[in-house]
Amino acid sequence: MPRSSEAGYCCLSRDSNMPDSRDDQQQGASMGTSPDNSQTSSLIDGRTLSKESPSHGLELSAPEKARAASLDASEEALWTTRADGRVRLRLEPFCTQLPYTVHQMFYEALDKYGNLSALGFKRKDKWERISYYQYYLIARKVAKGFLKLGLERAHSVAILGFNSPEWFFSAVGTVFAGGIVTGIYTTSSPEACQYIAHDCRANVIVVDTQKQLEKILKIWKDLPHLKAVVIYQEPPPKKMANVYTMEELIELGQEVPEEALDAIIDTQQPNQCCVLVYTSGTTGNPKGVMLSQDNITWTARYGSQAGDIQPAEVQQEVVVSYLPLSHIAAQIYDLWTGIQWGAQVCFADPDALKGTLVNTLREVEPTSHMGVPRVWEKIMERIQEVAAQSGFIRRKMLLWAMSVTLEQNLTCPSNDLKPFTSRLADYLVLARVRQALGFAKCQKNFYGAAPMTAETQRFFLGLNIRLYAGYGLSESTGPHFMSSPYNYRLYSSGRVVPGCRVKLVNQDADGIGEICLWGRTIFMGYLNMEDKTHEAIDSEGWLHTGDMGRLDDDGFLYITGRLKELIITAGGENVPPVPIEEAVKMELPIISSAMLIGDQRKFLSMLLTLKCTLNPETSEPTDNLTEQAVEFCQRVGSKASTVSEIVGQKDEAVYQAIHEGIQRVNANAAARPYHIQKWAILERDFSISGGELGPTMKLKRLTVLEKYKDIIDSFYQEQKQ
């Protein structure tokens, strides 16, 4: 029996002549749609399918039946580099949960969450929502469209666009059709797109705008596997061969029988690849991280449980999707975990990181939220700017409330019975701040993908917002360690996800060693890169992360830096840069970015950038200092309000204050080889467009070393002479 019936889909408007078997069903006001969807442009026709409706054509199976995937992988290796390869799942003896596929996960979710709102999106300034039934049916339609376009097993559909329902439909549809989901960052150059699309053998590329379409048109001749491009947010500028809109894709898919799609779904196995995540490629070409269906479904279930994500039966989680879905952290959190637990995922505008994110947060009021450290830092800086512009009494009230709350959270972090002053501070001040940020209902705030400064963590603790860390890699399907309201320790990355394992190798006297991981989260291998796969996975199957850290007596992990980032001075001293960089930023609130230098050099030096405002249109750093930076200048006796005033004129007061701050950091250093002896302030803050930051705002150290080579070399010229 086919698992689907026809469900209307329309990106821009509904065709009134389109036949729809549900036209006789009067369910427009049921949960999951807005009552006026039929009058507004919509992704679907506006009616929610109920479980009892004969039109949905779904024969829901019991969980036991859905999980009964035949799997005989006893002879498989733990790794493969072939897109069509299989691996032996890491079931025994620590993680015996039955494996299942993405389709089985979604199909089970329909039984529990079918009528709940799944995806929220804005059309003509109004929020619209679709249910999990509609989500599933549209994904099937997209899957059939991909099959009609010629998607082959173990080939990819590459997606190049901002977060949207269509991104989700394309991803889920790809897996249903037996393909491999491959995200490409929207900031990627045509050359980077060409490398990834060629490496993953993309049969179809899905883009959102004409700008992204133009990139693909430039490189199409160099992509032998590419058969078609689908564009969804705006139509192509003209009719082009093998370029389709999303509506045309779905129309083509109607020619594929439901039974043909079901046959493909039924042959899928949990130990086959379904997602490719490409690393940033800071030391060469990007590596394609192959993730199996079991990697995805196991992590979506158990990784999120470790973060206290709730199933919709208890409380439907509401999340805002805005971080790049090409990154595993956003993809596993927004897309796959959402399906597992029946969350409602609402999409922010494409310019969310340029300043509109807070508007979406206020409108949606998420129950859990994830941001990379740079996002949390920008929120902190914005609050500080607003506070600086407030009246004397309001500013003092905020400082008092944050001081009282920070002290309470530091001294009695797990005490639910807070003293009267803390409750008063929260009621009078902090609750209003959280509401203004859109966090009034947010119970869990996560961060990952990069280290977070102690200053930022303490700032949000002062607002009664705990930031819960997760630690993992693309190669561990995202979270291998998680913090939660019940598993929290300040500055730590949480504890290992139950069912996973960790060990530290080559530990020093302080217990710091390389972090090695084992479990169902561990990737299949790097696509077409056997040597790199052997470097990452040892003979016993442990993933060597390249990250350094230590474990406390309770199993909480503390990251100390990257093995590859470890600075080895000319004198043979091993210096982890991150703690020193964080100490400088903590000591000097005017500093935005700090990067330590000294590998194979006789002493340490540092590049600094100043906190500046961002252009609201482009999100580029401007020359204007933030309010916090201006306050710092005033405190030290400077009238500067721009970066150029400080750097161009070598502002004596600011330079002296920075010198004194660095001397204080040096005074607290373990030994003289850890002292910063020279430093320079750059004329512009680090940014994605400048190349110093990656798509998730992670510092690209090799790029910085190359870009500012002349400045760095000048630090050491006297030494050479």
UniProtKB/Swiss-Prot annotation:
| Signal peptide range | none
One family from Pfam that matches here is AMP-binding
Q: Where is the composition biased (Polar residues)?
A: 26-43
Quote the CDD domains the UniProt record gives: ACSBG_like (cd05933)
Q: Where are the Phosphoserine modifications?
A: S34, S50, S53, S70
What switches on expression, per the entry, is described as: Down-regulated by gonadotropin.
In short, the EC number is 6.2.1.3
Q: Which residues carry this modification: Phosphotyrosine?
A: Y655
The subcellular localization recorded is: Cytoplasm; Cytoplasmic vesicle; Microsome; Endoplasmic reticulum
What biological process terms from GO does the record include? Answer: long-chain fatty acid biosynthetic process; long-chain fatty acid metabolic process; ovarian follicle atresia; response to glucocorticoid; very long-chain fatty acid metabolic process
Q: Detail which positions bind ATP.
A: 279-287, 469-474, 547, 562, 698
GO CC terms of this entry: cytoplasm; cytoplasmic vesicle; endoplasmic reticulum; plasma membrane
Q: State whether keyword DNA repair applies.
A: no
Entry-linked InterPro entries: AMP-binding_CS (IPR020845), AMP-dep_synth/lig_dom (IPR000873), ANL_N_sf (IPR042099)
Name the domain of life: Eukaryota
Q: In which tissues is it expressed?
A: Present in testis, at a lower level in brain, and at a very low level in ovary. Not detected in other tissues. tested. Present in Leydig cells of the adult testis and to a lesser degree in the seminiferous tubules in spermatogonia and Sertoli cells (at protein level).
Keywords from the UniProt entry: ATP-binding, Cell membrane, Cytoplasm, Cytoplasmic vesicle, Endoplasmic reticulum, Fatty acid metabolism, Ligase, Lipid metabolism, Membrane, Microsome, Nucleotide-binding, Phosphoprotein
What's its job?
A: Catalyzes the conversion of fatty acids such as long-chain and very long-chain fatty acids to their active form acyl-CoAs for both synthesis of cellular lipids, and degradation via beta-oxidation. Can activate diverse saturated, monosaturated and polyunsaturated fatty acids.
Q: Which family does it belong to?
A: Belongs to the ATP-dependent AMP-binding enzyme family. Bubblegum subfamily.
Protein name per UniProt? Long-chain-fatty-acid--CoA ligase ACSBG1
Q: Which organism does this sequence originate in?
A: Rattus norvegicus (Rat)
Lineage of the organism = Eukaryota, Metazoa, Chordata, Craniata, Vertebrata
